[in-house]
């Protein structure tokens, strides 16, 4: 048996996740340090927000706190940023927005304070600019005052051009917080057809972006952009997300979906959130915000790059080889594309999890260790299952009434003969059903062995 498989920490993690699964939560909260696990538990018990939403929002907040200050290197020339595109899916009233507000509050507080500082500095700047150069010199002020910039983390609806300007002033990174994600992707074609979507495809990979502004002498050059995205979306409009080229150009595959098993409306209770919970969460994020970083001669951040220990890298490669075998057996190109993006995400998860543990005093940040890799694997498996569930919903939305009726009548596990009988009873010919079955392997159905199948979402 491998040494990492009998580590006591892994056994404790499994026990924690078993407990949460029994309560109807699939998100592996054991990936977080004990301090953050307690925060998630208290927020859930007090407000009845789904644990999946709280955990996903907290994961994204930690990623934003890291931003461009730390990167992870898997091998020479292959470096990843902790960029996440996260979508919380649920029915109206499913408490999707409130967990986001809790997780992002430290950034809101920071942005508010920085805006106060900016307003004062801007008033002073305007006052100086209203003076002549001679008057400024005589009063002991700078001859050529520098216009102040507003430091911030959070942005909402903004064009790529406006976003580039804000990012140039905030090189640590930004987070697009869209309460309704549908507004984000519906705006992709509002100006130049498809250009905004291409912008977000590039940002996901942290590719250099250049924005040429109208009537400007210089371009805005972002060497390594960092913009994470998080927001909510209703289950019934998921199909909007897959419209146009978004399902064929891999855009939708870059989104991490969170869809709790339990979609019940929260019941009110008398439990109050302990005062120290919000304080502890603020302290965790503020430690990330306040960490020092080095700027080079061009004003660019020199990130701290984390490598993997040999054991950690060995475990990661072992997982990837197994995952590649899944891809080789998969006949659905859409599913293969999702798996390929998850191979990128697992590296990013490693960085986020290691830094979360460091922030809570559970480890150092010299290397990414095996415990972090194991936790990243569990998180990746969670998002894999979520992505498959979303694909199933998208495919069901695309079914005609006859196909939908047959899918509904099929048992969770079935043979080809059973399925053909149900299909024929509903007016579908055998050959047509065989084609329908084969076309939906990996999205609606899973092939167990020759002649035997199961429904992905029974």
Per-range role (PLM):
Residues 1-458:
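Phosphate-handling catalytic cores of nucleic-acid transaction enzymes
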């Amino acid at each position: 048996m491998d040494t990492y498989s009998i580590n006591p920490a892994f056994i404790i993690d499994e026990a924690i996740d078993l407990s949460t699964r029994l309560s109807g939560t699939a998100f592996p909260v054991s990936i977080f340090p004990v301090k953050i696990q307690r925060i998630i538990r208290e927020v859930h018990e007090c407000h009845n927000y789904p644990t999946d939403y709280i955990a996903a929002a907290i994961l994204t907040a930690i990623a934003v706190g890291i931003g461009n200050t730390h990167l992870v290197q898997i091998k020479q020339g292959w470096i990843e940023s902790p960029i996440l595109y996260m979508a919380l899916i649920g029915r109206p009233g499913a408490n999707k927005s409130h967990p986001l507000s809790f997780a992002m509050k430290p950034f809101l507080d920071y942005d508010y304070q920085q805006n106060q500082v900016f307003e004062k500095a801007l008033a002073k700047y305007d006052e100086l600019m209203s003076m002549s150069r001679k008057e400024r010199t005589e009063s002991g002020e700078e001859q050529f005052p520098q216009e102040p910039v507003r430091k911030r983390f959070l942005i909402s609806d903004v064009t790529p051009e406006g976003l580039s300007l804000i990012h140039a002033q905030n090189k640590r990174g930004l987070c697009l917080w869209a309460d309704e994600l549908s507004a984000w992707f519906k705006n992709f074609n509002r100006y130049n057809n498809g250009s905004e979507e291409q912008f977000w495809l590039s940002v996901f990979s942290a590719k250099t972006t250049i924005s040429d502004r109208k009537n400007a002498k210089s371009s805005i050059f972002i060497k390594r952009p960092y913009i994470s995205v998080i927001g909510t979306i209703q289950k019934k409009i998921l199909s909007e997300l897959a419209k146009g080229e978004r399902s064929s150009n891999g855009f939708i595959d870059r989104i991490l979906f969170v869809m709790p098993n339990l979609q019940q409306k929260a019941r009110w209770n008398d439990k109050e959130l302990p005062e120290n919970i919000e304080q502890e969460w603020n302290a965790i994020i503020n430690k990330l915000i306040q960490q020092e970083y080095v700027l080079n001669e061009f004003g660019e951040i020199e990130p701290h790059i984390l490598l993997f220990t040999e054991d950690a890298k060995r475990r990661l490669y072992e997982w990837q080889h197994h995952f590649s075998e899944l891809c080789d057996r998969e006949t659905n190109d859409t599913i293969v594309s999702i798996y390929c993006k998850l191979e990128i995400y697992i590296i990013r998860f490693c960085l986020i999890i290691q830094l979360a543990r460091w922030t809570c005093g559970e480890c150092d940040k010299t290397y990414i260790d095996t415990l972090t890799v194991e936790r990243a694997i569990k998180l990746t498996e969670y998002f894999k299952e979520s992505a498959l569930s979303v694909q199933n919903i998208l495919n069901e939305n695309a079914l005609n009434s006859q196909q939908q009726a047959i899918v509904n009548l099929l048992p969770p596990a079935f043979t080809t003969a059973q399925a053909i009988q149900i299909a024929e009873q509903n007016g579908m010919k055998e050959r047509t059903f065989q084609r329908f079955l084969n076309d939906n392997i990996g999205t609606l159905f899973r092939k167990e062995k020759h002649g035997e199948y199961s429904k992905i979402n029974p």
